């Protein structure tokens, strides 16, 4: 390292920062250092030695609810993971995906994957959409494992990265209300550890343990109140999972029971499921039923889906950066990312009676 520093005309500390991915050196400096290292045949600091000196493993974990298969198949989760991977690679830090069950009862045993994180196989964890009372969350906080949350849990002293879910939900509902829709169906991700049964009117949907969905539903109520439309009929159904099959089953039941003229989905996956069900039933979109999603995953653009855009990859990058700062002993912080309504071709005026 000393020879590389001399050849590059920088300090040894700068060489160390370059290889650790630290922001203390510019990209131009980093390239000069790497070029000098290549000329000298230097391949970088000894990772094992560095880990021993710092007491670190060099790997972070990402806790995802449900199975790993569901996580990688969900386009929104995949974009979050992409952002986390980008930051981890720059910092030369490994990444481990840790699935956790949706259980929240303290009387039930925790997910068996957790001992891996608690045995010191990771230096810290990113928690994605875990309930605040999940036993895994309690175990992590009790053992003071460096952690950051994406969307939830929201707990005192725990850094998190999120969006204004309530405000975004209000924008989503306001859009369909402004088109004249008064009979609206909501296809939701699971509002708690177990999906609710059947189609329910919005006022009957309570309590909601998932923080971001609780805020979305509050946003829907805000939009209705602001529009002065107490007679609007809104029915909610929960899909068993965030996949097309679960979404299609939920949408089919919603259409049969509530006959909505607009479908508001809490994810693009379920919005696409709605489009598939409507097409199979020869129900024209948006002439007879409008559909709006949430996330603006790549499939939304392909399907011409109106949706709420959230910066998924950027949320992942922010969470990973905050976690690496925590592991290094730097300040805790939180981040709120912006959202945007993206109007495409799946929403339009309500049909005339």
List PLM regions with ranges.
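Bacterial carbohydrate/catabolite-sensing allosteric modules
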Residues: 39-40, 86-90, 141-149, 153-353
């Amino acid at each position: 390292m000393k020879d590389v520093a001399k050849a590059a005309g920088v300090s040894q500390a700068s060489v160390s920062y370059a290889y650790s991915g630290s922001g203390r050196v510019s990209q131009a400096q980093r390239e000069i250092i790497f070029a000098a290292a290549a000329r000298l045949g230097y391949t970088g600091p000894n990772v094992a030695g560095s880990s021993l000196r710092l007491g670190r493993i060099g790997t972070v974990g990402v806790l995802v609810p449900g199975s790993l298969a569901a996580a990688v198949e969900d386009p929104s989760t995949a974009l979050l993971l992409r952002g986390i991977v980008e930051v981890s690679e720059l910092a030369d830090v490994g990444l481990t995906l840790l699935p956790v069950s949706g259980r929240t009862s303290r009387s039930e045993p925790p997910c068996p994957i957790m001992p891996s994180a608690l045995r010191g196989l990771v230096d810290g964890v990113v928690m994605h959409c875990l309930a605040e009372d999940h036993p895994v969350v309690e175990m992590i906080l009790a053992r003071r494992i460096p952690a950051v949350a994406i969307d939830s849990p929201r707990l005192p002293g725990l850094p998190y990265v999120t969006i204004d879910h309530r405000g975004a939900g209000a924008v989503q509902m306001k859009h369909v209300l402004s088109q004249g829709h008064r009979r609206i169906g909501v296809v939701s991700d699971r509002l708690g550890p177990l999906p609710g049964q059947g189609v329910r009117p919005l006022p009957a949907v309570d309590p909601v343990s998932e923080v971001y969905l609780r805020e979305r539903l509050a946003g829907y109520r805000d939009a209705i109140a602001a529009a002065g439309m107490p007679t609007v009929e809104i029915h909610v159904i929960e899909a068993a999972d965030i996949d097309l099959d679960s979404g299609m089953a939920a949408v089919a039941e919603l259409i049969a029971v509530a006959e909505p003229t607009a479908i508001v989905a809490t994810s693009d996956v379920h919005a696409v499921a709605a489009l598939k069900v409507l097409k199979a039933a020869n129900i024209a979109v948006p002439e007879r039923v409008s559909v709006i999603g949430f996330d603006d995953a790549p499939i939304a653009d392909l399907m011409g889906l109106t949706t709420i855009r959230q910066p998924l990859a950027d949320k992942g990058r922010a969470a990973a950066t905050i976690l690496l700062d925590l592991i290094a002993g730097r300040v805790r912080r939180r981040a709120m990312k912006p959202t945007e309504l993206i109007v495409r071709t799946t929403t339009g005026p309500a049909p005339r009676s």
